[in-house]
């Protein structure tokens, strides 16, 4: 099954990752290594001491500035905490059903029990605090076929790489091994674990550790030599094969390890062909390939016998043009496809091996995000999933293959579904392309033009905007805010071609789309520039930062999280571990003057100029390997100088100089270096900044605590 990908800004909630499809396993790896992976490099060349002094200066500046927000931050933080508790969905999403046991995570502990015997069978298998690893979150859990061993990956807030802890389960749980720098792992047999090695945010090697060997020594299984490729592992839904997936932005290659004979060398499915991306599943003796070939092509499902070349693959199903394949669940005799067309989610059930469409179901119009349940049984007759939106908490649904019926779980809250409006709009971009956008709001006595508007954008790597439920978004809409999600080119909301139209020398399409979406909303009477703000994270910072340069009067404030703001210098520095990999998204300015000129034309850092900028707040992480702090220090310094220069040149009062802040947190991960409590305060601070800079009234539920 696939997992939706983005936790870019909202509150962090730790959940176990229990199993993914080949489709999502590889997409997640690509996204992890590049989709939200951004490097920045300042052109302000300084020695270590100089930039450390600049960093210390920025920290002091922010400490002085944040004093004026403190009362509002405290009250917002309390309200967010209360709302989070009231909308908590419990631990059921972290549960893994494995034969007669249910595994679950609770406050850093992993436990299991037999549902038929109740609490008497409860076992505590692992307590993360007892490992002495510091503040770690549980990332993934993998149980061996006969439940002799359990592998758990844990990730600390201070580093990108995870630690894999192996627990022996029979005769009482016991930690036997810790394997450092692991990105993904899968059990081939009850005692053989395959795992990838992550070094400098790259995965290039696969190892196998045999725990029947007293030494538990790791043996090298596969090495990827092309720096454009990222390696990930996935176990097919029927547990027959482990796939070794090597993927660049545009090309794939998959090898199979047969779990019945795991010591045999991996078997190549199809040699890599430039422009061909594919993923592999297995069912009833057939391999199923999810494949796309070419920039404009959408995904197709094909089938063949094991070890057949590309010419022997037979078509089974094809995704329609301008349709996004959101998720996929492969079962024994069926495949469930979750699709998005015109921003509307739907479910299609196809029979295997024929590929005939057995049923098509439109999902509720309010739904913006989908998450499949963890690892349904391969031969199960039902598939569960949750639907949500930024303002609607998850609602659980089940599809019955036997009844051919979709049902909603009445035990899950549907609170607020009818309180809020979900409006699907389209804006005409500069070249006439229709760009979809989603507007969320609640009825209010206040006129639409006087209400604050928060605009969201990403527009890179073919990834959708994250539109899952977040309590801070719910709170804003309850207070009368409008939330706009601009599905610009470069993202994936309209399928693979939508990404192709916003990549390489078409990146400016995404910028034009964003400006057109905001202007369209204002033209329809939804808010106005004085009450509008933009929010973006990571690669979304490219478009948000570029729009600050090209159309700063469209909005009053911008909040950025670990943003990518210096595309040109990043892509010219091949010593950075991901620069070569990123060339398929941004181009190579070192070898092609065309790309050098083109990137320079939109790069946020390169195009800062004296003008009246919006207020800016950037959240950064001191040891972030993906967006090094030096680059953001250079950006902030140049932006602040440009704002001051404009003030002096235009004779504007210094009181009108926009507030430009860099809030630096300790930690070494990208966008998620904080504990839950720290994330709560970060979000509250971002909201307080927006309220103050847009000159809004204090939220009515916060007035008492700020006086």
UniProtKB/Swiss-Prot annotation:
Question: Per the UniProt record, which EC number(s) apply here?
Answer: 3.4.21.-
Active site as annotated: 538 (charge relay system), 624 (charge relay system), 670 (charge relay system)
Superkingdom per UniProt:
Eukaryota
Q: Mind giving the lineage of the organism this protein is from?
A: Eukaryota, Metazoa, Chordata, Craniata, Vertebrata
Keyword Cytoplasm part of the UniProt annotation: yes
Identify the keywords attached in UniProt to this record, alphabetized: Cytoplasm, Hydrolase, Protease, Serine protease
Q: Which family does it belong to?
A: Belongs to the peptidase S9A family.
Q: Name one GO cellular component term.
A: Golgi apparatus
> Which BP terms in the Gene Ontology apply to this protein?
proteolysis
- State the name under which the record lists this protein: Prolyl endopeptidase-like
- Has UniProt tagged this entry with the keyword Protease? yes
How does the annotation summarize its subunit structure?
Homodimer.
Query: What organism does the record attribute this protein to?
Result: Xenopus laevis (African clawed frog)
> Where does it primarily localize?
cytoplasm
Please describe what this protein does. Serine peptidase whose precise substrate specificity remains unclear. Does not cleave peptides after a arginine or lysine residue. Regulates trans-Golgi network morphology and sorting by regulating the membrane binding of the AP-1 complex. May play a role in the regulation of synaptic vesicle exocytosis.
């Amino acid at each position: 099954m696939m997992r939706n990908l983005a936790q870019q800004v909202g509150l962090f909630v730790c959940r176990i990752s229990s199993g993914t499809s080949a489709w999502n396993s590889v997409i997640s790896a690509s996204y992890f290594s590049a989709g939200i992976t951004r490097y920045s490099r300042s052109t302000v060349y300084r020695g270590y001491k100089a930039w450390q002094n600049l960093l210390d200066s920025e920290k002091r500046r922010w400490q002085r500035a944040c004093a004026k927000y403190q009362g509002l931050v405290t009250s917002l933080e309390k309200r967010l905490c209360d709302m989070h508790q009231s909308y908590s969905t419990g631990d059921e999403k972290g549960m893994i059903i494995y034969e007669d046991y249910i595994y679950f995570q609770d406050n850093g502990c992993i436990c299991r029990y037999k549902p038929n015997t109740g609490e008497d069978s409860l076992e505590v298998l692992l307590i993360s605090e007892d490992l002495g690893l510091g503040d770690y979150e549980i990332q993934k859990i993998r149980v061996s076929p006969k439940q002799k061993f359990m592998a758990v990956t844990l990730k600390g807030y201070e580093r990108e790489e995870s630690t894999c802890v192996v627990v022996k389960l029979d005769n009482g749980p016991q930690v036997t091994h810790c394997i450092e720098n692991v990105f993904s792992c899968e059990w081939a047999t009850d005692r053989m674990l395959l795992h990838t090695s992550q070094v400098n945010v790259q995965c290039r090697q696969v190892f196998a550790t045999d725990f029947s060997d007293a030494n538990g020594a790791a043996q090298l299984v596969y090495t990827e030599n092309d720096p454009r490729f990222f390696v990930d592992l996935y176990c097919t839904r029927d547990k027959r094969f482990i796939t070794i997936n090597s993927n660049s932005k545009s090309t794939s290659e998959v090898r199979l390890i047969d779990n019945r004979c795991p010591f045999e060398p991996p078997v190549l499915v199809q040699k890599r062909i430039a422009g061909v991306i594919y993923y592999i599943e297995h069912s009833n003796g057939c391999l199923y390939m999810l494949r796309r070939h070419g920039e404009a092509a959408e995904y197709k499902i094909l089938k063949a016998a094991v070890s057949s070349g590309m010419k022997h693959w037979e078509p089974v199903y094809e995704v329609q043009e301008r349709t996004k394949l959101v998720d996929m669940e492969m079962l024994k005799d069926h495949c469930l496809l979750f699709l998005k067309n015109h921003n509307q989610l739907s479910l299609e059930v196809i029979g295997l091996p024929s590929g005939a469409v057995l049923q098509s179901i439109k999902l509720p119009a309010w739904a913006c995000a989908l998450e499949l349940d963890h690892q349904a049984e391969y031969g199960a007759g039902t598939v569960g999933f949750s639907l949500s939106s930024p303002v609607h908490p998850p609602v659980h649904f089940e599809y019955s293959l036997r009844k051919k019926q979709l049902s909603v779980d009445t035990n899950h809250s549907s609170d607020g579904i009818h309180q809020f409006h979900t409006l699907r709009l389209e804006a005409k971009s500069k070249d006439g392309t229709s760009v979809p956008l989603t507007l969320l709001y609640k009825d209010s006595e206040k006129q639409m033009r006087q209400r604050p508007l928060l605009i969201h954008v990403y527009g890179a790597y073919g990834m959708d905007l994250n539109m899952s439920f977040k309590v801070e978004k719910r709170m804003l809409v309850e207070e009368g805010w409008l939330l706009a999600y601009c599905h610009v080119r470069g993202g994936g909301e309209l399928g693979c071609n939508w990404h192709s139209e916003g990549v390489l020398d078409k990146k400016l399409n995404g910028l034009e789309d964003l400006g057109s979406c905001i202007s369209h909303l204002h033209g329809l009477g939804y808010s106005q520039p004085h009450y509008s703000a933009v929010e973006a994270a990571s690669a979304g910072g490219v478009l948000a930062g570029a729009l600050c340069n090209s159309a700063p009067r469209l909005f009053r404030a911008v909040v950025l999280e670990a943003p990518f703001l210096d595309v040109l210098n990043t892509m010219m520095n091949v010593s950075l571990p991901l620069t070569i990999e990123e060339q398929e998204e941004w181009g190579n300015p070192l070898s092609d003057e065309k790309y050098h000129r083109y990137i320079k034309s939109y790069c946020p850092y390169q195009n800062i100029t004296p003008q009246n900028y919006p207020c800016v707040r950037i959240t950064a992480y001191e040891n972030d390997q993906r967006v090094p702090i030096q680059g953001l220090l250079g950006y902030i310094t140049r932006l602040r100088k440009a704002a001051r220069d404009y003030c002096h040149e235009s004779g504007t009062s210094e009181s009108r100089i926009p507030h430009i802040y860099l809030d630096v947190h300790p930690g070494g991960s990208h966008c998620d270096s904080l504990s839950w409590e720290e994330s709560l305060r970060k979000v509250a601070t971002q909201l307080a900044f927006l309220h103050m800079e847009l000159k809004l009234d204090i939220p009515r539920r916060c007035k008492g605590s700020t006086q």
